[in-house]
Structure formats: C-alpha cells, structure tokens
Amino acid sequence: MPLRPFIPLHPVERAEQPKRAASRCSTCALRTVCMPPDLSPDDFARVDAMICTTRHVRRGETLFRPGDTFNSIYAVRTGSFKTIVMHRDGDEQITGFQIVGESLGLGGVYTGHHNGEAIALEDSTVCIIPFGQLEQMCREVRPMQHHVYQMMGGEIVRESSQMLLLGTMTAEQRVAAFLLNLSSRFKARGYSAAEFVLRMTRDEIGEYLGMKLETVSRMLSKFQRKGLVAAQGKQIQIVDSEGLRQI
C-alpha cells in the first residue's frame, strides 16, 4: 500500500524562509547540547540548511508574545530568557528561565499560537528553527524525531517538577532546589557547576518560586550562615551541594 504524501502541520511559507547567516549547527560548540549526538554528516548538512539564521534580542526585549502565530521554535545560543504566562486577572507568572542550549516556544505546537511571552534577561541570541521543516526532517531522520520527543518530554517533566516545587516544598527547599537545578544545567553545558551568575533578579526568582523577594534574600542569607553557599550580588558559589540536597 503506497504511503500518503506527508503534509506538515506547520508549513513554512516562502516569505518566511530566512536568509542564510554565518552560523552553522555543524560547527557550533553547543551542537552536542542542542542536537542529537548520532546525526550523520548528511543530516547535519540538512540541519545547517534548516537553521540558517539567528536573531539578536536585547535585554528586556520580547522574543514572542501571547497570541503570536507559531511558526518556529528557538534555541538559546547566547544569553538567557524568562518565560511568562498571563492569568485571567491580569497577573503575570514566571514559568521558567532558559539558558544557553535550551529551547523556547514549544508550547505553540498545541494551538498554533504562542500562549506565553519570552523576554531576554540579558543581550541574547537565538537560533530560529522553522517547525514545518523540522517536522519533515523528523519523519525522515529517526534520531531527530527522538530528540524532539525528548525535548517535549523534558517540558512535561519541567512543568510537573515546578508543580511539585510550589505545592509541597518549604521556602528553604524551593530555593535550594532552584540553585541545584541551575547548577546541573550549567554543568551539562560545560560551565562551572559551583560558580555562576544569576541573570534574573531576586524578585523574579521569588515570582517563579511563589514567594516574596524578602523570603528569597532571607533563604540565601541562611544558606550563607550555614556555609552552603557564598553570594555576592548576583554571583553565586555553591560551597556544599550535598548540604543543599539534604535540606
């Protein structure tokens, strides 16, 4: 029985086709983070043809807003972002912080429109991945298909972890879990797991963790007194990671 022709759910129109930029996935230092490790040279050539442009987003600028048409997902190449959803009463809720090598915009797959907002925490760069082309490649390249499944599964795990964090943990446990989570993500990208800079404000951390700025500051001060962390401004040093895990 012949296969029916594949029609992508999110086709990329000709006018949306980006012009080629100098950056290439095949030579990017982050390719082991963003891409499957077992792509062939021919597959990487296809990826280079697909992800052929980047976008610079200055600190405080928005990458996408609620209601924007979903055409692409984004991979953070440099910098960092926060994602926000708006409640019906107009209040905002920070739902995550994305660092180098992580994706943005996957939620738009569901309705064809972005349901939240992504704002740069610092001057940042993203790689633009047209989702219609990615769908086609996933159908033909099994490692890429599996990688996209992993990305979507990771989003589900992240959201369920946040629900657990907000629903069952004490304020002390929330801040400890937040620092350990950042530490492991930086380590996975080849950065120091023990020393890093918090690009978000303590007020933003509190909004994400469901607590006030003063509570975040009080918990960090408590960790310093216990010798678990050293903090100077936004610079964080994890002195005793095992101690943080035991909180």
Language-model features, listed with the residues they occupy:
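Cyclic nucleotide-binding regulatory module and flanking cytosolic helices
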Residues: P2-R59, S103-L104, G108-Y110
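Cyclic-nucleotide recognition modules
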Residues: G96-S161
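Short alpha-helix-to-loop micro-motif enriched in aromatics/charged/Gly
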Residues: R88-T95
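Short phosphate-coordinating micro-motif centered on Lys-Gly-acidic
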Residues: T62-D68
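Polybasic "coupling" helices that flank or enter modular domains
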Residues: R139-K212
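Glycine- and acidic-residue-biased ligand/ion/polar-headgroup-sensing regions
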Residues: G60, N71-I84, I99-G101
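Local beta-strand/beta-hairpin segments that build beta-sheet-rich folds
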Residues: L63, T95-G96
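Phosphate-/nucleic-acid-contacting segments
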Residues: S184-I247
